[in-house]
Amino acid sequence: DSGTYEELLPITIPAGVKLHGAGIRTTNVKPQAGLSADGVTPNNETTMFYVNNACTVTGFSFSGMTGFTPSGSEPENLELATIKGVFFAFDPNGAITTKSPYIKDCSCFSEGGVGAFMDRQVHNTGNKSMVFHAFTNLNSNGVGFWVRYGAKSEIVSCFTYYCHVGYSTTTGGKIRALNGNNSYGTYGVVSDGYDPNENTVNGNVEGEMIEYADDGVHQAYFANGETITGGTSNAT
């Protein structure tokens, strides 16, 4: 139904369950004041929704989460940031086994919140994936989507505004994004690191290569239109 719902967090959405709001302009979910369900963490700095296999969320706006703080030394690197105030994350007690959680036709609004955090380390089995369609993130100085440690996400028609980072993958996270945009924030799209558990595909590159040797240059610059030829390989 329409209305503003102030909730004790986190909320766990069971596998196969659909949450259907009356519309993003009429149904809003936000954290109630005080502490979260653990009795320690501020309610607006915990996770709003833990999602599970084949669950769906549609037709809501979300607001009020906060707590994200970027690293002072590497502000673009979310691995070094303080992550709080997440709207969507994997349920630590679940697994994505047949269908990804699907968040569509929703918006979130926050000062320092994180729209979605997908961390493969949370799950030992399953697909470790989420799917988003038309999930708009207005998280001032926060984060839109962060995919970590080989987790996977498809992000379609999702726009971020004023985020410190719009889309981020680290340590082998994977994003397939279509028809999206990151506007007015600090960093649009950031990728860093690799999956330490990934099996590499090794190969050789065939061909010649020119190596630049500083001590062998006789002119201060190359002339426009000049052809450069390797002294040994004769590659041009």
Language-model segments: residues:
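Extracellular beta-strand-rich solenoid/capping regions of secreted or surface-exposed proteins
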Residues: 4-20, 28-59, 63-96
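Short, T/G/N/S-enriched strand-turn elements that build extracellular solenoid repeat scaffolds
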Residues: 5-14, 18-19, 47-51, 87-96, ...
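All-beta strand scaffolds that present successive hydrophobic residues in beta-strands
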Residues: 18-21, 56-59, 96-105, 124-134, ...
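A generic "binding-loop/recognition-motif" signal
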Residues: 25, 112, 151, 163, ...
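Surface-exposed loop/edge segments in extracytoplasmic proteins
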Residues: 25-30, 234-236
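Autoprocessing Asn-cyclization modules and mimics
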Residues: 49, 71, 75, 79-80, ...
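Right-handed parallel beta-helix
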Residues: 56-150
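Contiguous, function-dense segments enriched for cysteine-driven chemistry
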Residues: 185
